[in-house]
Amino acid sequence: MGYATKSPWVIHYDASSCNGCDIEVLAALCPGFDVERFGIINTGNPKHADIFLVTGSVNERNISVVKQIYDQMVEPKVVVACGTCACSGGIFHDCYNVIGGVDQAIPVDVYAPGCAVRPEAIIDGVVQALGILDEKSKALKAAKRGA
């Protein structure tokens, strides 16, 4: 992974969970783990975000929200599923309204499993996402030049 031309912006959404992974996401943003050393900026606006960080499983009620956030993001974009619930539905997998992991609604690029997912795994997933984002950005630029 080379040097980024801009700081990657991350939007976080809790689909539905026990909030254990959300606490770990907050821990990853704290000075103890210093995720900002990678230039990562947290945003609440999907139009500004490069990385979509999702915790929790997708259910009948929130699947449209997950899709809307994803659709509002500008290309190139990367999705990181954080926690067992986001990866596969987790402990809520057999509930009546749970569809499953995030990949049942949108394409997922990086999986960071764990219950609750550790801040180190979240940071590792985001760093992997940065590499994928760089590749997608190069492919998008090449496609624009070729068009």
Predicted segments with their positions:
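Iron-sulfur-associated redox domains of electron-transfer enzymes in respiratory
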Residues: 1-147
